[in-house]
Amino acid sequence: MALSIHDKKIIVSKINKISNTALSAVTADLQGVCVNKINELRKSGREVGVKMSIVQNTLLSLAIKNTVFECLKKKLKGSTFIAYSMIHPGSGARLFKEFSKKNTQFKITGAAFEGKLLSILEINQLADMPTYKEAIIKLLLTWKMLIAGKLIYTLSAIKQKKETS
């Protein structure tokens, strides 16, 4: 059943609002992927703050017009599945990357971050970027190792000083 103009305007408005607040966007071709798997992907996306939708390319290109994701227009071909990362810039890319490993038909077609169209290498880097929590944990572990190293160095210096005295 075809959508009315009113329904199309609502879809464009909704996607445009999401586009204006999202940190990054990733598009994929889901041709040949089972609906149940897509629903599982959407469920896991909601848990990490990723908003996903399947939108007609014409409506999507209208929705992303005059946003930082306008550069994605070049990548809109076939059935487009778009994921907007709302909390962490790499969430959508990480989710799609993991999903494409398990489902070979699922192909990541493009991504945009800070108004720039990303290459496949940059999409992988965005997906591998640690979350805020992971970055803090790594920083604390580094500090812990540095403090432990300084303590060992200080204790060995005291030991050497006592041995020479």
UniProtKB/Swiss-Prot annotation:
- Keyword Ion transport in the entry? The reply is no
Q: InterPro entries per the record?
A: Ribosomal_uL10, Ribosomal_uL10-like_sf, Ribosomal_uL10_bac, Ribosomal_uL10_bac_type, Ribosomal_uL10_CS_bac
Looking up SUPFAM superfamilies in the UniProt record yields: Ribosomal protein L10-like
A biological process term (GO) from this entry = translation
Does the UniProt entry include the keyword rRNA-binding? Answer: yes
Top-rank taxon = Bacteria
A molecular-function term among this protein's GO annotations? large ribosomal subunit rRNA binding
| GO cellular component labels | large ribosomal subunit
Keyword annotations of the record: Ribonucleoprotein, Ribosomal protein, RNA-binding, rRNA-binding
Cite a single Pfam family from the UniProt record: Ribosomal_L10
HAMAP family in alphabetical order: Ribosomal_uL10
Belongs to which family?
Answer: Belongs to the universal ribosomal protein uL10 family.
Subunit description: Part of the ribosomal stalk of the 50S ribosomal subunit. The N-terminus interacts with L11 and the large rRNA to form the base of the stalk. The C-terminus forms an elongated spine to which L12 dimers bind in a sequential fashion forming a multimeric L10(L12)X complex.
* UniProt function note: Forms part of the ribosomal stalk, playing a central role in the interaction of the ribosome with GTP-bound translation factors.
Name assigned to this protein: Large ribosomal subunit protein uL10
Name of the gene encoding the protein in the UniProt record: rplJ
